[in-house]
Design a protein with these regions (language model features):
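GG-anchored amphipathic helix commonly corresponding to the ABC/SMC/Rad50 NBD signature/C-loop
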Residues: 23-47, 55-67
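ABC-family P-loop ATPase nucleotide-binding domains
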Residues: 1-38
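Preference for short coil/turn "hinge" residues that link or interrupt alpha-helices
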Residues: 16, 45, 76-79
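Residue-identity detector for glycine
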Residues: 14, 26, 41, 85, ...
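C-terminal lobe/lid and adjacent interdomain/linker elements of RecA-like ASCE P-loop ATPase modules
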Residues: 55-76, 80-136
Length: 136
C-alpha cells in the first residue's frame, strides 16, 4: 500500500523527511512523486488516480510533462480519462483479451466520462427513478 511506501521512504532517506503520514493520501502521494522524480527516470504508476483528486490528476499531467523534458518515461496503468489524456501518450488497451494501441477518444474511460457529462441530467433522473438501492 502507499502507506507502506511512505513509511519505507522515511526509513531509507536518512534525512528529515516529509511528514507523509500527517498529510492526506493524495497530498502525500503527490509529495513523494515530486520529491522522488529525477532526470532519466523510468516510473511505473499503478492507478495513481486512486490517490488523486481531479485537480491533482491535472497537476500530475504537468509534473509528468516536466519530467519528460528531463528524459523520463512513465508506464501508467489507469482508468482515468484525465491521465489518459496526456499529449502524445501511447495508450495500450488490455480489453477483450488482447493488447492493442488505441486512440484517446476511443478508450472506454473517455467514452464513459463523455457520455456521463453530455447526458448528466438523464443519468440523475434515471438514478432517482430506477435505483432500488442496488449497484448500477
Amino acid at each position: 500500500s502507499f502507506y507502506n511506501v511512505a513509511t519505507k521512504e522515511m526509513e531509507y532517506s536518512g534525512v528529515l523527511s516529509e511528514r507523509y503520514h500527517d498529510q492526506s493520501h493524495g497530498q502525500s502521494f503527490f509529495s513523494v512523486l515530486m520529491k522522488q522524480t529525477n532526470k532519466n527516470g523510468l516510473y511505473f504508476l499503478d492507478e495513481p488516480e486512486a490517490a488523486l483528486s481531479c485537480q491533482n490528476q491535472l497537476a500530475l499531467l504537468y509534473l509528468i510533462e516536466e519530467c519528460v523534458k528531463q528524459n523520463c518515461q512513465f508506464i501508467i496503468a489507469t482508468h482515468s480519462p484525465i491521465l489518459l489524456g496526456f499529449p502524445n501518450a501511447q495508450i495500450l488497451s488490455f480489453d477483450e483479451d488482447r493488447v492493442e494501441e488505441v486512440d484517446y477518444k476511443s478508450t472506454s474511460s473517455y467514452q464513459t466520462m463523455k457520455l456521463f457529462l453530455d447526458r448528466y441530467d438523464y443519468f440523475v433522473k434515471d438514478i432517482q427513478e430506477n435505483n432500488d438501492g442496488g449497484v448500477l
